[in-house]
């Protein structure tokens, strides 16, 4: 069966996350139903990162197997036609070999978190930022973030319901910068624990507020205690922005 790789973007506001659920609408369900309507057979899609309810994606990667060859532009355009009016869009489709796996072939995942740091609440960006109305020091947040880089036990930032077999992760990037009224947090790793990014952002917010210094943020990490973590940053500010793969994994078959 030919395998296809799709790059997908979506607004997570209306969805109960990526993964199919019995009652609530999810991104996986919307995408599978759209593809099934044009290929006229059951389809299962597999993603690079299972985003939570309210989390967005500008570059989610999925793979799926179809029972015949289709032009890649047909896969993209027909899926988008059947997705309307869902806030989901297939940006590209490509043929890949049978060994490509959107999740297991990934080398690195990239996320961005947006904090709106001003007194006035958002009107246009509501649903896409965390509004923090008190002053934050982005430079202090960035300095504290650097203490989290490398391979560590990230249990302090892990959700209680996280199903990962190990809390060890290698954090490759955690940068914080201010752009006008917004503070942007960019982070990259091969994989993250459930709620890890949002837990780190909430803790860095405390550093920006002056409630934790750099050593205090590192102490949270070293404690391995979820109770020491800052508040869980809201899902709305988080976007999956990219997934990296080795070139060999992206090669077209034949």
Curated annotation (Swiss-Prot):
Active site annotation, chain numbering: 52 (nucleophile)
Primary enzyme class: isomerase
Reactions it catalyzes: uridine(38/39/40) in tRNA = pseudouridine(38/39/40) in tRNA
Gene3D superfamilies: Pseudouridine synthase I, catalytic domain, C-terminal subdomain, Pseudouridine synthase I, catalytic domain, N-terminal subdomain
CDD domains xrefs: PseudoU_synth_EcTruA
Entry keyword set: Isomerase, tRNA processing
EC numbers, comma separated: 5.4.99.12
SUPFAM superfamilies: Pseudouridine synthase
Domain of life: Bacteria
GO molecular function: RNA binding; tRNA pseudouridine(38-40) synthase activity
Binding site for substrate: 111
A biological process term (GO) from this entry: tRNA pseudouridine synthesis
Endpoints of the signal sequence: none
InterPro entries: PsdUridine_synth_cat_dom_sf (IPR020103), PsdUridine_synth_TruA (IPR001406), PsdUridine_synth_TruA_a/b_dom (IPR020097), PsdUridine_synth_TruA_C (IPR020095), TruA/RsuA/RluB/E/F_N (IPR020094)
Subunit composition and interactions: Homodimer.
Purpose of the protein: Formation of pseudouridine at positions 38, 39 and 40 in the anticodon stem and loop of transfer RNAs.
HAMAP family referenced in this protein's UniProt entry, alphabetically: TruA (MF_00171)
NCBIfam families noted in UniProt: hisT_truA
Similarity comment: Belongs to the tRNA pseudouridine synthase TruA family.
Name used for this protein in its record: tRNA pseudouridine synthase A
Source species of the chain: Methylobacterium nodulans (strain LMG 21967 / CNCM I-2342 / ORS 2060)
């Amino acid at each position: 069966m030919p395998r296809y790789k799709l790059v997908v973007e979506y607004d997570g506001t209306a969805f109960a996350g990526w993964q199919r659920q019995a009652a609530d609408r999810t991104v996986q369900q919307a995408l599978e139903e759209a593809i099934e309507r044009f290929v006229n057979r059951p389809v299962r899609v597999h993603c690079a990162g299972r985003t939570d309810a309210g989390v967005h994606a500008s570059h989610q990667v999925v793979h799926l197997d179809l029972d015949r060859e289709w032009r890649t532009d047909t896969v993209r355009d027909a899926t988008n036609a059947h997705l309307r009016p869902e806030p989901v869009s297939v940006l590209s489709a490509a043929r890949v070999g049978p060994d490509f796996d959107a999740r297991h072939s990934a080398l690195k995942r990239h996320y961005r978190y947006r904090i709106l740091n001003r007194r006035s609440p958002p009107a246009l960006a509501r649903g896409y930022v965390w509004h923090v109305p008190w002053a934050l020091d982005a430079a202090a947040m960035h300095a504290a973030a650097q203490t989290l880089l490398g391979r560590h036990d990230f249990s302090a930032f892990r959700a209680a319901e996280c199903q990962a077999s190990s809390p060890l992760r290698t954090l490759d990037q955690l940068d914080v910068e201010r752009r006008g009224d917004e503070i942007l947090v960019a982070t990259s790793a091969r994989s993250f624990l459930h709620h890890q990014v949002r837990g780190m952002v909430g803790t860095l917010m405390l550093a920006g507020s002056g409630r934790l210094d750099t050593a205090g943020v590192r102490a949270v990490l070293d404690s391995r205690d979820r109770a020491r973590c800052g508040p869980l940053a809201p899902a709305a500010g988080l976007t999956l922005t990219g997934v990296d793969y080795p070139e060999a994994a992206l090669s077209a078959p034949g």
